[in-house]
Amino acid sequence: MKLSRRSFMKANAVAAAAAAAGLSVPGVARAVVGQQEAIKWDKAPCRFCGTGCGVLVGTQQGRVVACQGDPDAPVNRGLNCIKGYFLPKIMYGKDRLTQPLLRMKNGKYDKEGEFTPITWDQAFDVMEEKFKTALKEKGPESIGMFGSGQWTIWEGYAASKLFKAGFRSNNIDPNARHCMASAVVGFMRTFGMDEPMGCYDDIEQADAFVLWGANMAEMHPILWSRITNRRLSNQNVTVAVLSTYQHRSFELADNGIIFTPQSDLVILNYIANYIIQNNAINQDFFSKHVNLRKGATDIGYGLRPTHPLEKAAKNPGSDASEPMSFEDYKAFVAEYTLEKTAEMTGVPKDQLEQLAQLYADPNKKVISYWTMGFNQHTRGVWANNLVYNLHLLTGKISQPGCGPFSLTGQPSACGTAREVGTFAHRLPADMVVTNEKHRDICEKKWNIPSGTIPAKIGLHAVAQDRALKDGKLNVYWTMCTNNMQAGPNINEERMPGWRDPRNFIIVSDPYPTVSALAADLILPTAMWVEKEGAYGNAERRTQFWRQQVQAPGEAKSDLWQLVQFSRRFKTEEVWPEELLAKKPELRGKTLYEVLYATPEVSKFPLSELAEDQLNDESRELGFYLQKGLFEEYAWFGRGHGHDLAPFDDYHKARGLRWPVVNGKETQWRYSEGNDPYVKAGEGYKFYGKPDGKAVIFALPFEPAAEAPDEEYDLWLSTGRVLEHWHTGSMTRRVPELHRAFPEAVLFIHPLDAKARDLRRGDKVKVVSRRGEVISIVETRGRNRPPQGLVYMPFFDAAQLVNKLTLDATDPLSKETDFKKCAVKLEKV
C-alpha cells in the first residue's frame, strides 16, 4: 500500500496517541488510516461517556470502517480510550435489530406471545390503540416514557414536547435520574443554576486533585491521562482519592483514602470544621458572595410510603432550609472533630489531616471531582452541597485551576437530560413544570393553549416502576436505555410491572437487550452516526455531528419514531375542550402539525443541506428538522445564562461551551472577566440566585438505608469497568472488549473469601433480601475491596446484579443508591 506523506504522518499520529494511553490501535484502523482516497472522514463526539472526546469517523461503502482520535478536538487532543478505538464495531453486532417485533399469538398481539416481525405501520397501529385507550380511560397519568442521557439534544426536546405538551403528561424521565439527578439538585440548591462552573482546562492549572467516589482511571480515562500528565510533570501537584474500595485511580494517589460507606458526609463536614478552626476562610469572598442555611434532616430514603424507614422519618422528602448565622454554622461543624471523624470513617487521622490541608492552603488550587460515589447515594444531594461548602469557604471556585466539578457518565446527560429538561419536573434552561411563569413561557413559544402543560410533577424513574407494578401506569415507552438491567430491585419493583397484562411496554433499541426481551413491542433504532445528532458534555460543551451512514434494514432514529408517531393523534383526542376553545385554530390538527411541522420549526429548507449530505428524517419531511428543533429550543436559554450558539456554528467547531455570547464561549462561569453575565466590579456573581450569592448548607451525617447485619454481613457496591460501558449492550458486541472482560466477577478481600471457604475462580451465590445471582470469586486484580465489602460491575446480562440492589433513593433528587446494600455469600 503506497502512502502519501500526509497519510504517513496521520497514521503515525494515531499510533503515537494509542501508545501514550497504553493502547493498541485496532487492525482495521491501522490498515485504513492511510487510504485517504477510499475513506471519507468526518467528525463526531464519542458515543460513550460524558467526557465528550472528539473522534474522526471513517466511512466506506455505506459502513463505518474506522475511528481515530480527532487531533483538533480540545477535549482529548487526538487520544482515544480503548472503547473509543472500537466505536465502529458497536454498530455491527450480529444480532442488530432491523425490523419492529411484536409479541403475537394466532396472528394478533398477545402478552405471552412470541416476538414476530411486523411493519412500522403495524407497530404504530398497536401503539396508537394502546395510547388512545389509556388516555381515554385513565387520562395522561396512565402513560409514560423513560428516556436517556444518550438521546441527542433534538431527540430529547422532541420527546419532551410530545409528552408534556402533546399528551399533557409529565411522566417522562431520563435514565440520568439514576446517575446525575443528585448533581442537578445540588447545583440548584447551592447556585440556583445547573452544571459546573469550570472546565477541563482547569486540569493543566491545578495544584491538587481530589476524587470523591470517582474512578477516573477507568470511567474517564482521557481526563485521567491529562491529570496523570499534570501530576507526573510537576512534583508539587497532589492527588487524593477517596473511595469505599481500592481501584486503579489509587495507583496515582499521594493520599489514597478508603472510608466506611456513607461516611463521606462526615469527612466533608470535618474538612469544613478544619478550615474554620485554622482560620483558612477566604473572608473577602465569603462575606460578599455566600449565604448560610440549615437544611431539614431525617428526610427518609425515597422508598415506598409504607416502608418502615419512610414511616419513621420525621421530614420525609423535605427540601426545606432556614437561614443561620456563621456562629451557628461554626458550632454545627465543630462536632465533626478529627477524632470523631477517624472513628466513624475508619480513616487514619494523618490521612484526614493531609486531605483537609489541601483545601485549607490558600496557595493551592484544588479541583474536586466526583461521579457516582457521590450521586448514587441516599444523601447524594447533601454530598454535593457539602463539597461546594469547602470551595465556597475558601473561595476556590470559578477561577482557572480550582473548583468543584461533577463529572457525567453519559454523552448527553448534561446536554439533553439536564439542559433540554427531559426530567419529570423540568423544562428547558432550568425551568420547572411547577412554576406557572415557566409553563407560560413554554406554552407561548410552542403556540399551544395556556394550561396545556400540567403543573404536577410527573413520575420519576423509580416511581414509574412502582406505578407500573401497581397498575397505575399502563403504557410505557423506553428509548436508548436498558433499565431492566440498569435499574434497581429488578425482581420486586420492575419485572412485575413490565409483565403485568394490564400494561403495554415498548422498547426502542438497536439490540435485543434484557429490556427489549422483557417488552411487548421492540422498535429497531438507528445508532450514533446513522443519524444527525448533538450531545452536551460535562464541561458544558455542545457538539454536533452529521449523519454519515444509513441504519440497517428498517431501523429508524428515535427522532423519526417520535415525530412519525405524533401524526397518529389529533388535538381533540388528547386535549380537553376548554384548552381547544383557547386556540380553536388548532382543532383537527395532528400533534405532528402542532409540535413539529410548525412555522417555527419547519422554516429551515432542505437547501441548507449539501446535496450529498445524509439526513433521513429531514429529507422525508421536506425541511431541516434538526435545525428547526434546535433553534426553537436554544431560544429558551439565550439571554438567561444558558446561551447556545447558532446551529451552523456547531457544525464548524469542535464544540462550544455555553454560555456562548457574541460568538465567544465561556470557560469559567460566575467570575468577572470570564463570564459575560458578571459585570465589571462585581468580582463574582452567582446569578442563578436572586441576590447573586451561593449557599453553604449545614447538613449532618445520616446512615445508609441498609447496612450489613449478622445475616447479610457484607456491603455490596456496584459500578463499571474500563472495557464495558453501562449494561454492555454495545461493548459486549465488540469481540476485543468482550474478550478483555468476558463476564462480571465478584471482587472480594482475600480474607473474606478465605473465611467463607472461597477461592479465586469459585462460583458463588450473592444473596440480598431482594434476590440472588451467581458470580465468580475474584480476590486479585484492579479492584481491591476492604474486608466487609464486595464489588460487582453491572455490565453482564447473565449476572443481573440489580436483582440485589435496593430501590432506596435520595429523597430530594430521587436518584438511586447503587453503592450500598447488604448481601451474604453462599458457595455454589
Swiss-Prot record:
<dbReference type="Pfam" id="PF04879">
    <property type="entry name" value="Molybdop_Fe4S4"/>
</dbReference>
<dbReference type="GO" id="GO:0009055">
    <property type="term" value="F:electron transfer activity"/>
</dbReference>
<keyword id="KW-0560">Oxidoreductase</keyword>
<feature type="binding site">
    <location>
        <position position="482"/>
    </location>
    <ligand>
        <name>Mo-bis(molybdopterin guanine dinucleotide)</name>
    </ligand>
</feature>
<feature type="binding site">
    <location>
        <position position="531"/>
    </location>
    <ligand>
        <name>Mo-bis(molybdopterin guanine dinucleotide)</name>
    </ligand>
</feature>
<feature type="binding site">
    <location>
        <position position="150"/>
    </location>
    <ligand>
        <name>Mo-bis(molybdopterin guanine dinucleotide)</name>
    </ligand>
</feature>
<dbReference type="InterPro" id="IPR006963">
    <property type="entry name" value="Mopterin_OxRdtase_4Fe-4S_dom"/>
</dbReference>
<keyword id="KW-0500">Molybdenum</keyword>
<keyword id="KW-0574">Periplasm</keyword>
<keyword id="KW-0732">Signal</keyword>
<comment type="subunit">
    <text>Component of the periplasmic nitrate reductase NapAB complex composed of NapA and NapB.</text>
</comment>
<keyword id="KW-0479">Metal-binding</keyword>
<feature type="binding site">
    <location>
        <position position="558"/>
    </location>
    <ligand>
        <name>Mo-bis(molybdopterin guanine dinucleotide)</name>
    </ligand>
</feature>
<dbReference type="GO" id="GO:0051539">
    <property type="term" value="F:4 iron, 4 sulfur cluster binding"/>
</dbReference>
<dbReference type="InterPro" id="IPR006657">
    <property type="entry name" value="MoPterin_dinucl-bd_dom"/>
</dbReference>
<feature type="binding site">
    <location>
        <begin position="212"/>
        <end position="219"/>
    </location>
    <ligand>
        <name>Mo-bis(molybdopterin guanine dinucleotide)</name>
    </ligand>
</feature>
<feature type="binding site">
    <location>
        <position position="802"/>
    </location>
    <ligand>
        <name>Mo-bis(molybdopterin guanine dinucleotide)</name>
    </ligand>
</feature>
<feature type="binding site">
    <location>
        <position position="179"/>
    </location>
    <ligand>
        <name>Mo-bis(molybdopterin guanine dinucleotide)</name>
    </ligand>
</feature>
<dbReference type="GO" id="GO:0042128">
    <property type="term" value="P:nitrate assimilation"/>
</dbReference>
<feature type="domain" description="4Fe-4S Mo/W bis-MGD-type">
    <location>
        <begin position="39"/>
        <end position="95"/>
    </location>
</feature>
<feature type="binding site">
    <location>
        <position position="819"/>
    </location>
    <ligand>
        <name>Mo-bis(molybdopterin guanine dinucleotide)</name>
    </ligand>
</feature>
<feature type="binding site">
    <location>
        <position position="83"/>
    </location>
    <ligand>
        <name>Mo-bis(molybdopterin guanine dinucleotide)</name>
    </ligand>
</feature>
<feature type="binding site">
    <location>
        <position position="53"/>
    </location>
    <ligand>
        <name>[4Fe-4S] cluster</name>
    </ligand>
</feature>
<dbReference type="InterPro" id="IPR019546">
    <property type="entry name" value="TAT_signal_bac_arc"/>
</dbReference>
<feature type="binding site">
    <location>
        <begin position="262"/>
        <end position="264"/>
    </location>
    <ligand>
        <name>Mo-bis(molybdopterin guanine dinucleotide)</name>
    </ligand>
</feature>
<feature type="binding site">
    <location>
        <position position="175"/>
    </location>
    <ligand>
        <name>Mo-bis(molybdopterin guanine dinucleotide)</name>
    </ligand>
</feature>
<dbReference type="GO" id="GO:0045333">
    <property type="term" value="P:cellular respiration"/>
</dbReference>
<keyword id="KW-0004">4Fe-4S</keyword>
<keyword id="KW-0534">Nitrate assimilation</keyword>
<feature type="binding site">
    <location>
        <position position="46"/>
    </location>
    <ligand>
        <name>[4Fe-4S] cluster</name>
    </ligand>
</feature>
<feature type="binding site">
    <location>
        <position position="81"/>
    </location>
    <ligand>
        <name>[4Fe-4S] cluster</name>
    </ligand>
</feature>
<dbReference type="InterPro" id="IPR041957">
    <property type="entry name" value="CT_Nitrate-R-NapA-like"/>
</dbReference>
<keyword id="KW-0411">Iron-sulfur</keyword>
<feature type="binding site">
    <location>
        <position position="372"/>
    </location>
    <ligand>
        <name>Mo-bis(molybdopterin guanine dinucleotide)</name>
    </ligand>
</feature>
<feature type="binding site">
    <location>
        <begin position="508"/>
        <end position="509"/>
    </location>
    <ligand>
        <name>Mo-bis(molybdopterin guanine dinucleotide)</name>
    </ligand>
</feature>
<dbReference type="InterPro" id="IPR050123">
    <property type="entry name" value="Prok_molybdopt-oxidoreductase"/>
</dbReference>
<keyword id="KW-0813">Transport</keyword>
<dbReference type="GO" id="GO:0009325">
    <property type="term" value="C:nitrate reductase complex"/>
</dbReference>
<dbReference type="InterPro" id="IPR027467">
    <property type="entry name" value="MopterinOxRdtase_cofactor_BS"/>
</dbReference>
<dbReference type="GO" id="GO:0050140">
    <property type="term" value="F:nitrate reductase (cytochrome) activity"/>
</dbReference>
<feature type="binding site">
    <location>
        <begin position="718"/>
        <end position="727"/>
    </location>
    <ligand>
        <name>Mo-bis(molybdopterin guanine dinucleotide)</name>
    </ligand>
</feature>
<feature type="binding site">
    <location>
        <position position="49"/>
    </location>
    <ligand>
        <name>[4Fe-4S] cluster</name>
    </ligand>
</feature>
